[in-house]
Structure formats: C-alpha cells, structure tokens
C-alpha cells in the first residue's frame, strides 16, 4: 500500500470575521486545493482585528492576513514579518458616515468623533484624508469601536468610521436600511495600495 506523507498544518489568522475578502481561501478549502497541496489549513477569526500580525510575529500562527499599510507600520516597529501574497489588489478602506448625516464633506468632521478598529494605520489614513481638507487628527476625537463599525454609527456613538470596507459595511448598511456615504482614501490624498 502507498504511504501518505503527513499533511503540513498551517494556521491562518484572518484580519476580520470571515467575509467575501477571504474568498480565495474559502474556495481553496472547499474545492480541495489545500488537500492537493498536502496542507491542512485552519482559518481563525481574530478576537481583536489589530492582533493577527503581532500573533504571527510571536509564532502563535503561521500566516496573518493584514492590511498593506499596517504591515508597513509593523515592519517599521521591527516586527519580524514578511509579505507573502495579496488577496485584494486595491483599497477597500473608506471613511463612512450615515447618508442622512450632516457630514457632507470631510471638512465637516471638525469637532466630530471618528470610530476605528485597527490603530496605527487607520489613524494615518484618516490623518492624510483630513489634511486634504485643512484638518488634522487633533480636529477629531478617535474612538476604538473594534468590530462595531456600522453599529457604532447607528447608535450615534460616533459620527464617522474609518476602516469600513466599501464591499462589506456599505452593503450591510444598505441591507439594514441605514445607508452610508463613503469617502475613499485614494480620492483624498492617500496613494492607492493593495488592501489585503
């Protein structure tokens, strides 16, 4: 009888709960591509979306899905990480307000509260966007809302959120009957980048 080599086990920490951005990983799992490569891949949703790169650097996982701008911050902070691939080739991040809010332009954020989920790069993206409208981060109050981007807007805990994905939160908000208005970083002073 033929002997089968043991499969290599790979733990992948996701950047967020499973969503359409992870489609290549889900498809590979469900169609047996990982099996064909002799891999047992475990996808793990994070308790905190800022932790996957730190956990991978601490050897608590083999791979972490993260954001390109966040990787640059982590490398600058000397985390032992290496980029191995791309899942999403263009920005998904956006600054979102409720469509019926008084905020019509980014300049209207002066004195307002902005929620975020991953510190370090979302505030940098927001800072660059604010600068194109004559504001700085000192002109807004930042609040970590973790995974509750849309709910924090609905509950009026924040006036805007940075880090909402245009292909997820905006659709979720429409489904919930609370449509959003998005400002895209690449249209407000941030160079285009690969999201995941």
Locations of the language-model features?
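Short beta-strand-to-loop elements that line the ligand-binding cleft
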Residues: 40-48, 65, 137-148, 182-185
